[in-house]
Design a protein with these regions (language model features):
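Glycine/Thr-rich phosphate-binding loops that ligate phosphate moieties of nucleotide
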Residues: 1-194
Length: 194
């Protein structure tokens, strides 16, 4: 199991709601992202508190770039959702490079997993299957299962087989994926302090 630290992922949705007042609830983001112009190239780099892995730049600052005359609320919301997936993609690629191993699947939990647009984009931009268990927050469940397995109360194979899941498969063309990711990397380069 590998883990990486990101400073600002799901909290970007809170920023849209509480600070910018663009939405009244996180649920609105999926519909707005789907309404956005698919050709829009707006990127949000949420370096409000610097950037964590793999950049480790505490002096990086947030930015919204690529705005055009046709960029509106829906496009900014989409850029906010996309930045979550881009940051995770940065981590996945860094982990693959550091370990020399290919990650086949992402297993994710938490509130943002309820957003179908975000989960499909995550699958598309990482080019990985995204597996989401029906249980929203797995940390507590996982700790209980680990204790139960250690005590001989639970069987790992049986538990794994009983979990219901939603699965997203990548659908994005490789050329489009790399073009979008290159745009993200350019946006990130623009905020780095080094």
């Amino acid at each position: 199991m590998l883990e990486g630290n990101l400073n600002y992922t799901g909290a970007v949705i809170t920023w849209l709601k509480d600070d910018l007042k663009l939405i009244s609830s996180a649920k609105e983001t999926e519909g707005l992202a789907r309404e956005a112009n698919p050709a829009d190239r707006t990127y949000l780099v949420p370096a409000f508190t610097g950037l964590g892995a793999p950049y480790w730049d505490e002096k990086a600052t947030a930015s919204i770039s690529g705005i055009t005359r046709t960029t509106g609320k829906a496009e900014v919301i989409k850029a906010a959702l996309d930045c979550i997936a881009y940051q995770i993609t940065d981590l996945v690629r860094a982990m693959e490079q550091d370990t020399g191993m290919r990650i086949e699947e992402l297993r994710v939990d938490g509130g943002p997993t309820r957003n179908g647009y975000l989960m499909q984009f995550q699958s598309d931009i990482t080019n990985k299957r995204v597996n989401i268990p029906d249980a929203e927050e797995l940390s507590g469940i996982g700790a209980a299962y680990m204790a139960g397995i250690s005590a001989g109360v639970y069987d790992l194979e049986k538990l794994a087989g009983n979990m219901k899941r939603s699965v997203y498969e990548p659908k994005m063309d490789d050329e489009i994926r790399e073009k979008k990711y290159a745009g993200w990397k350019k946006a990130v380069d623009g905020v780095l302090s080094k």
